[in-house]
């Protein structure tokens, strides 16, 4: 943990977190672990600990527990506390831990304080709940959260949250806001935001299956990305990253054509499959993650069969086995 403690200079702590995150982004993909549940839907702390340890063994650049892939929206405060604390314990400082927070600013602050106490290094602020908001309101939301926590913040634009370049410029001036995760894939808008921000402001590709657009994001100055595939097949995720950064266009194209693009097509069949398919694939690999919680649904038998075939194909491509 590198976040500033009581009495310390928060600016120093933020700089250390930014440095470690930048190093992690340069070294590997960003990992968003699933949250483990028992079959009855209760939180499975032991399964989650084992699963997080497996993710860490696969070498991510940073760990983002209790975020969208981790079903933050379905966790109560005690479950959230356990999820973040276990992630912090398992990483033991090896990589930064960025916990999710969100909803309205008051709820976001409650989760932020829990994450602080649990030892997180930073927070990913997910889109607020339900209502649309003007740009001034989006910036004010981040300002209020930043004023109420010592932890550095990464804004997440997705759904109803989409910052203009001017709003991103304003965010860069908010003490404590260190970066932006983009889930819109509007590359014109993102390019303008990158140009509006100082060099030390972090950006990363947070599309649902980020590898499909990784080359396009890199072209506008955002080479770092989160990988949902790392949550169930780090062999594939790591092989893709190595090929991408090594200029191995043939391998990149083959993985995209035979695995990633078909995965996106399967994902798009049913709302919520961006999480449900990931969790089902992890179960196919023997990971102790359990089912999703409502309102998400587990894949249908036909879609699970298609996922099994696709996962086998992807693993074969990188010399691994189901």
UniProtKB/Swiss-Prot annotation:
Its EC number is 4.2.1.41. The keyword Heme does not apply. One of its GO terms (biological process) is D-glucarate catabolic process. It comes from the Bacteria. Pathway: Carbohydrate acid metabolism; D-glucarate degradation; 2,5-dioxopentanoate from D-glucarate: step 2/2. GO terms for molecular function: 4-hydroxy-tetrahydrodipicolinate synthase activity; 5-dehydro-4-deoxyglucarate dehydratase activity. It catalyses: 5-dehydro-4-deoxy-D-glucarate + H(+) = 2,5-dioxopentanoate + CO2 + H2O. Disulfide bonds: none annotated. Keywords: Lyase. The keyword Transmembrane does not apply. InterPro entries: Aldolase_TIM, DapA-like, Dehydro-deoxyglucarate_dehyd. PANTHER family: 5-DEHYDRO-4-DEOXYGLUCARATE DEHYDRATASE 2-RELATED, DIHYDRODIPICOLINATE SYNTHASE. Belongs to the DapA family. This is Probable 5-dehydro-4-deoxyglucarate dehydratase 2. It comes from Streptomyces coelicolor (strain ATCC BAA-471 / A3(2) / M145). The lineage of its organism: Bacteria, Bacillati, Actinomycetota, Actinomycetes, Kitasatosporales.
